[in-house]
Amino acid sequence: MALISIRTSDDKIEIINQLLLPHVTEFVQIDTIEQAHDAIKTMKIRGAPAIASLAALSFSQYLSRALQASPLPEYFASPEALKNNLEPVLAYLFTARPTAVNLGAATRRLTTTLNQSIAQGKTTRSIAQDLIDEGKAIADEDVGRNKAMSKWGGDWLFDRVKAGGGSAEKGLNVLTVCNTGSLATSGYGTALGLITYLHETGKLEKAYYTQTAPYHQGSRLTALELKTLNIPSVMICDTMVGSLFQHFNIHAVVVGADRIAKNGDTANKIGTYNAAVIAARHNIPFIVVAPISTVDLAVESGLDIPIEQRPPIEACLVRGILYPNDGNSKQAQVMITPSGLDGIYNPSFDVTPAGLITAIVTEKGVAVKGEGENIFDLTPVV
């Protein structure tokens, strides 16, 4: 059974606290916009599609509870008053993680719905209901998109390997970075969804994944997802990618994305660029799998993508259960560096240039570069 990042029931929202995984499964209830913002900011929930879903759902919850109030809040006095209240709420949610374009796409979509409903002359109650429905739709649409892009990418990759005369009798060996499965989305996943699809169709031999320091999304989250799904897998340290390519038959690297520029430059979890450079050296296809909402056509290239800088202390700490242990799941956080370091560089993301990317997959299909081109035309897949 696949893991889930968000579960809802009526007006109740709960997220799995990913900071405690894989050793403790704890659901945290989200009751306010501020709690949703904090959960995203502190990475209790992460993954571009998942944080967009949580933001949209918490916004729907905010309005749903407002409609249940008696009397209605003062900002329901007029459409203009409602707009003046809601626009700052959406802007605040967007500040939680600025690099992930899905979050911005969700807040812009809700803003568009707000303005359209006002322009149609609807009552404040009807405007609020439109926004509630739109917020829920943003989250609900994610799973279908993920399954579509996973099939597009999986079939394309398998056909490419076969057409190139590659050995895939036992299935494909695929490396991924970070965590892009059900924990990073509303379900199934993007790059990890592609791996899951290959496994489900008998076309996967083994999945490989990097630990993805300093937050260890690979060793904590991807490891747990693959184990839960019974997908054969091997973990490697981030610094072992080159060695893996030298000694094993790896057919592709598949990664997700937090933002894709118009030309195909892709921002993803730190360490992605390293893997792309080494993959190019070994002529291994490098594939980005992400929903259309991750493509930001307003950004010309990766140079214009803002890169979130995480607190320096996060690069100095690791969390896990005590080892050896007596069977309990008591966790500890320890510092692995000396105190008082002169400096710590801790970006959450890096940008892989389009020239290093073989294909970009969305729910609409697979985009490849033209002959001799170093940039993508993403028009057919957005």
Curated annotation (Swiss-Prot):
Keywords assigned: Amino-acid biosynthesis, Cytoplasm, Isomerase, Methionine biosynthesis, Nucleus
One function term, GO molecular function aspect: S-methyl-5-thioribose-1-phosphate isomerase activity
Active site: 258
Cellular component GO terms held in the UniProt record: cytoplasm; nucleus
Primary residence: cytoplasm
PANTHER family for the chain: METHYLTHIORIBOSE-1-PHOSPHATE ISOMERASE
UniProt-recorded name of the protein: Methylthioribose-1-phosphate isomerase
